[in-house]
Amino acid sequence: NNCPQDWLPMNGLCYKIFDELKAWKDAEMFCRKYKPGCHLASIHLYGESPEIAEYISDYHKGQSEVWIGLWDEKKDFSWEWTDRSCTDYLSWDKNQPDHYKNKEFCVELVSYTGYRLWNDQVCESKNAFLCQCKF
């Protein structure tokens, strides 16, 4: 585990919650600038969800939802991770994703589900965000 203090080590990567509220693209750029190879977090296994949820619940100071690195760039329900990893696991909240009013193309962890379930949201919304890095 080479993760710095207050980062969550998991499956060879390190995850950190940032409480500053940013639009989705700005959050992704922040993660990329933090260190080469960093992105908004991708989640791949059922087992990763509770660990990430618990970490966010412990460290997230605000009440906001939390951006992860999943988005629908083509706006056709073909969800992709910004780190280009395969979209092999999805954990949507009920009745999601819905592209509500055809405006929701970025994915957040939903606070009232304890950050376990996902919702598609307007990408310009300001949320806290979860970066993942290799150290």
Curated annotation (Swiss-Prot):
GO terms for biological process: defense response to bacterium. A motif (Galactose-binding) lies at residues 96-98. Ca(2+) binds at Q96, D98, E104, N119, D120. Expressed by the venom gland. SUPFAM superfamilies: C-type lectin-like. InterPro entries: C-type_lectin-like, C-type_lectin-like/link_sf, C-type_lectin/snaclec_domain, C-type_lectin_CS, CTDL_fold. It is found in: Secreted. Its main location: secreted. Homodimer; disulfide-linked. This lectin displays hemagglutinating activity on dog (128'000 HU/mg) and cat erythrocytes, that is inhibited by beta-galactosides (D-galactose, D-lactose, and N-acetyl-D-galactosamine) and EDTA. In addition, has been shown to hemagglutinate promastigote forms of Leishmania amazonensis. Also inhibits Gram-positive (S.aureus ATCC 25923) (MIC is 31.25 ug/ml) but not Gram-negative (E.coli ATCC 25922) bacteria. Is a calcium-dependent lectin. Belongs to the true venom lectin family. This is C-type lectin BpLec. The lineage of its organism: Eukaryota, Metazoa, Chordata, Craniata, Vertebrata.
